[in-house]
């Protein structure tokens, strides 16, 4: 039997799926049930109990951005006014929404953060700790993706509860691309002009690359790499993937107009991530008009983004002396031109970042409009707006993107819940929240019991653990004051090392070294009663360390060989090999000592003054050290421990390659 049937055009697999569902429905009917499908049997066991204005189990539309930070404190009044006038979709979501204004990510960069959001767990458990690009390709041995049989995703949780689940746009949690035979060249789903190729899109749809992760509807390739058409909007003439992702989102919403089951859809956009493409080399190619160049500066032609974007506090940060900060920060600044490209921290660079936000806001608006035009679905759907991480944009001594530090420019991102019925006007809270809270809160809003679903998911996943975040649904529904959660800390971790890998060669063909250790970071943010008359102040404590789990032999030793100079130049060169060990012997080195930062964010919101060695803050430091240890223990889970034959729980033994 062929994959396509002769008379219907349906794939054999989909016919089998339909037959399977029909069989389940028939069995359920024979048993006297309502005829629910296999995917919805859990939902039958968990009837929905209305809560205030939430009368029925909601649908969810997650709108995810890439690289959009929460507005920093040094924004000018002019920029604030511009955002209000030029980001209508974001402001529309706020008008009938609830915004958490102190929302923090769990990890960086794209892959670790996204895997964390959609599993509710940290990289220490799900294993997605590194980001492809720079020194690493998507197929390298030391770049691990999420295995579908380990930690369940949001799609798996909600499918177990009877939801239909869809993904449109950027994924970046597993290697979901289809490849052309004999190569690692991703199969495009568009023409050479950037137009949609529906036949190629259908191949992606039929392959169901995210089925094991609990989602359907993904169309690749992933939006990264050297092809300008794989950007958000920086292909020829301003074309890119975001426009297409919006179209796909609208098409899916139209199909869901009469959906029988509750549904969850992720509309995942690229921009303002295209800011990472800006630099001396890409701009030179852009302005020369060469074929295959990124369309960057040309997007600013006719742009109304102002030039006076920031107050003087930004310039103080951009000119900061990093010699008083952990050494990884200065090392990252020095290595950036080699790992990516030289970049001038100027006004046009800053304006481009906000122009990209305006561009993607338009595409998000297309999706939100499609939802709003369906009155019933709009009433029954909670829209969640968030970003995977922020962007430094040249602050703190000229740092770009999002690695090797834990400043608010990276950690704080937008987090908005929107629904025209649940939220009467704009509401906001400054309690500390985290990406770890997203999944538990959604389960809470859906009236789903985590323990019941977890028990079912253990049949298909090896690492079904308690979700480490909090259910904030009681705050959103007005049942509980946000102040109830005000003393809860948030935790952040990153082991991402973009300049360490097999492809550590600059655009000029020169080999470069990784960022100086210690460069792994873990942080805790909390409120403490250290202000006048015991008022609460927001504190942040960062630990920089050399995590031995990122070594070539995890927990034992790290062997690195560096051959300096141009990689394509013939002749002899001297290679230098270093061996770092937990217990070093002769000729080996020990890992460097940890380094720390302590900030009073209420007094010092731009994080310029490191109080770690300040004797007046020693009492606060001790408290923050305890909190970091507690948060690490509670949230930085490790792969477990499966029962052995005698019933005991033991760690899987590590076997070196």
What are these regions (language model features)?
Residues 1-11:
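N-terminal secretory signal peptides
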Residues 10-28:
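N-terminal export leaders
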Residues 20-23, 48-58, 65, 70, ...:
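Long, internal low-complexity/basic segments
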Residues 54-58, 67-82, 256-261, 269-432, ...:
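Active-site-proximal cap/lid insertion segments
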Residues 62-65, 69-153, 157, 163, ...:
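Active-site segment of extracytoplasmic enzymes that catalyze sulfate/phosphate-ester chemistry
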Residues 118, 214-232, 368-369, 402-486, ...:
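Substrate-binding rim/cap in mid-to-C-terminal beta-strand-loop elements of soluble/periplasmic
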Residues 119-241, 276-280, 288-291, 486:
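Catalytic-site neighborhoods of secreted/periplasmic enzymes
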Residues 173, 407-408, 494-612:
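C-terminal, low-complexity/hydrophilic appendages and adjacent surface loops
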